[in-house]
Amino acid sequence: MATPDSLALFTGLGLSENKARETLKNEALSTQLREAATQAHQILGSTIDKATGVLLYDLVSRLRDTRRRSFLVSYIANKKIHTGLQLSAALEYVRSHPQDPIDTKDFEQECGVGVVVTPEQIEEAVESTINKHQLQLLAERYRFNMGLLMGEARAALRWADGKMIKNEVDMQVLHLLGPKMEADLVKKPKVAKARLEETDRKTAKDVVEKGEVAGQTLSLMEQLRGEALKFHKPGENYKTPGYVITPYTMDLLKQHLEITGGQVRTRFPPEPNGILHIGHAKAINFNFGYAKANNGICFLRFDDTNPEKEEAKFFTAIYDMVTWLGYTPYKVTYASDYFDQLYAWAVELIHGGLAYVCHQRVEELKGHNPLPSPWRDRPKEESLLLFEAMRKGKFAEGEATLRMKLVMEDGKMDPVAYRVKYTPHHRTGDKWCIYPTYDYTHCLCDSIEHITHSLCTKEFQARRSSYFWLCNALKVYCPVQWEYGRLNLHYAVVSKRKILQLVAAGAVRDWDDPRLFTLTALRRRGFPPEAINNFCARVGVTVAQTTMEPHLLEACVRDVLNDAAPRAMAVLEPLQVVITNFPAPKPLDIRVPNFPADETKGFHQVPFASTVFIERSDFKEESEPGYKRLASGQPVGLRHTGYVIELQNIVRGSSGCVERLEVTCRRADAGEKPKAFIHWVSQPLVCEIRLYECLFQHKNPEDPVEVPGGFLSDLNPASLQVVEGALVDCSVALAKPFDKFQFERLGYFSVDPDSHQGQIVFNRTVTLKEDPGKI
């Protein structure tokens, strides 16, 4: 609860009562503001005026480096910094000059200290600006953009008071144009504005709300918003809030720039213990996209520090997926490339008293408040001998670890740097029986590769302190770690452990089952890489976690396939139709456009014979209101043929079911136009078609409230339907795995790798957009 004294102090500084109460809820901010006010009061020896108070509040709200706060408070209290513009310049200066001492002469020059802008100077600058635009002003009068005059005058007088400039602009414009007339009060027509808004909508950033995305596809870097727009330039790591500066920082950054030439460097560092999923696609796009947008480079680095969980197939699959998405790594590296250097640095930490060998068991280190290690203060000479013994295999797994002496953001004390593992490594064999942890490896590999922007998902925020601490403890270049929100999808699970459970339960076939959202599964289902990249771009990069609807990803898929997938015709539930008056003694060759909306993309031929097959759902014995397809007394057109068929006879099987139809045909232009045209096949290929739906029935299958029985109890029994006797036109006969088609009126389909000579297997990628008028 706010104390009366504190509330009075903050309102006395110029804060509204609501703002003061809000500030008091933030203990760190209110403490800093109280300290700043106390210092200012000591300097002034009197009550702090509101203008000074507002600047003090602005200062403590924006400055995270408390070392410089006292320095700037003294300038504010002494009225050397007395405008918001000067304060912004001062904050930028101290961020750009992190090392003491500050060059006060240079600082004051950059912040306009002592600069006095007279009313005469303001009058002269405004007059010069108005003279420059006088003809346009006289023509447009008060419809002229007065902000332009303000901006140019302020540019000429950087430290002038903004209100004084505005008053002078208003006065001189009034003197030039006179009072506003009736015509000046008429609002501008909105036509031009509407056109501008229409253009803006086509290029503006998409807005993500409640899992919905609006707007057109832009590149991922055009979608960057929020904190990502404030990334530091290479070599200016110290400008990042929270970045730790040591006496060695500036020299190390100078060396870093000499090595990189100021180049942006990012990395995508997956663990090779599973298959990449849709969330990784965002990480790939962000890391590779940011580097590409800034003419930089991106490493693909495998974090191979867990030998018992790593398999060769995962290395291959990860690399394949990165390149499938269209990215080429600058270099493929492995954490194991640096094992020798990492070990040498671990020894250095022990020498410096910053790491020790501990014998607590894994179970003792778990939980929120594990007991402190009784070996934390053992002599470093002893830890050196024990660490060497660990390396030589003299401890069993779990008997000894190397721990670093620090406390992380989440309160975790002394994270493990090395542990004993006797599993042979896929690259180093049995050279090592101790392996570094993620907390130890990650930042040091970034340092070795001179990464400028270490982009991680939000769960790694708790490890940022160990990231900075370790680089600084070893006096090596320290990159900047920046965390962003993960991308999740409804109706999906992406956890490696849970996917393994799905496979073990027989719910899916493997990691690439098209019902999953692993990248290999999406590729098998037929999702184009461009669509996945577009989806990531639409979602954008924010600090907040994002959970999206699958239909938004599917919309991106349709956008790409509409222009990329040639058309074909297929029938899932065939009904034989015999044309009794077929107009030719042999089949006709029908020329079908690959893309009906753009016939310049070519044609293919399909046979049209006296026997065709249509969808059983495209026939009803008796027509109904609103029904437009084939029925008794209701003819229907056959797409692309130029013919209309009309029912003559229904042939039934022994069970009474309709077995085939006998129809007559006529030219479409020889009579009344039919209500509808349907797709068909003739002399077709028999194929297998797999139809996919959501794997789970609820949006959040992992939510114990929504699904009390666990995600395995939420499986959708209709998630896969196999149509074994489907028919498809012969234009697809030479299709290869992953070739994609639009089957007219049905959806987009991709050739599955299970296809073999004699039978093609198709996966339905996505349905067509729903047509409310189709009955």
UniProtKB/Swiss-Prot annotation:
A GO BP term here is: negative regulation of apoptotic signaling pathway
Q: Which CDD domains match?
A: GlnRS_core
Q: Which residues form a coiled coil?
A: none
Record-linked SUPFAM superfamilies: Nucleotidylyl transferase (SSF52374), Ribosomal protein L25-like (SSF50715)
Kindly report, in one word, the top-level EC class recorded for this enzyme: ligase
Q: Which domain of life is it from?
A: Eukaryota
- Provide the positions where the record notes the PTM N6-acetyllysine: K309
Query: Which positions are annotated as binding L-glutamine?
Result: D303, Y438
Keywords annotated in UniProt: Acetylation, Aminoacyl-tRNA synthetase, ATP-binding, Cytoplasm, Ligase, Nucleotide-binding, Phosphoprotein, Protein biosynthesis
Q: Which catalysed reactions does the entry list for this protein?
A: tRNA(Gln) + L-glutamine + ATP = L-glutaminyl-tRNA(Gln) + AMP + diphosphate
Q: What is the protein's known function?
A: Glutamine--tRNA ligase. Plays a critical role in brain development.
Q: Which family does it belong to?
A: Belongs to the class-I aminoacyl-tRNA synthetase family.
Record's protein name: Glutamine--tRNA ligase
Organism of provenance: Mus musculus
